[in-house]
Amino acid sequence: MPKVALYNQNGQTIGEIELNDAVFGIEPNKHVLFEAVIMQRASMRQGTHKTKNRAEVSGGGRKPWRQKGTGRARQGSIRSPQWRGGGTVFGPVPRSYSYKLPKKVRRLAIKSALSSKVLENDIVVLDQLSLEAPKTKEMVKILNNLAVDRKALIVTDELNENVYLSARNIPGVKVVAANGINVLDVLSHDKLVITKAAVEKVEEVLA
């Protein structure tokens, strides 16, 4: 089982914590991580694109000029796609791009993401994270104590309003509850700052 240092909010090492091998100690599967990120990014797409086809554009149904005798190419409608202002053929329509990967694959992906953070030594485990009031200054101080000076994902056992409000104005820092942890967030942040209670909650679900 991988062991990592356990810190307090002052950045002091107060012990060690053993992480579950089945969650934090597997060989990261890069292909599964790729598939999970693509799935999440696809679900984030708006899908509100739309073009008008020849039935929807403005213009009458009258034939622009007679079939023969003008010397011009024959035309049946000013709404044809080759006309300026004509309808689009096979244009995009509003749709949802979201899809789901199998549950086993999604679980393997999040385990791979967490294990990669342990392998790269980019995980910081806190005994607890609590603030008496929402103070951005206090959160910056805690992160400085922990030597976290890059993009960081903070994971708590449940969403703490004071922690969330204190971190939301810090560039590159995001706070999520343990039940909302996902592959894209873990991989797109350089450091994973997670509380001991959140580790237990994640292990309970994924182990």
Curated annotation (Swiss-Prot):
Family: Belongs to the universal ribosomal protein uL4 family.
Name by which UniProt lists this protein: Large ribosomal subunit protein uL4
Entry's Gene Ontology molecular function annotations: rRNA binding; structural constituent of ribosome
DNA-binding among keywords: no
Described purpose of this protein according to its UniProt entry: One of the primary rRNA binding proteins, this protein initially binds near the 5'-end of the 23S rRNA. It is important during the early stages of 50S assembly. It makes multiple contacts with different domains of the 23S rRNA in the assembled 50S subunit and ribosome. Forms part of the polypeptide exit tunnel.
Listed Gene3D superfamilies: 3.40.1370.10
Pfam families for this protein: Ribosomal_L4
Coiled coil region boundaries: none
Superkingdom of origin organism: Bacteria
Originating organism: Geobacillus thermodenitrificans (strain NG80-2)
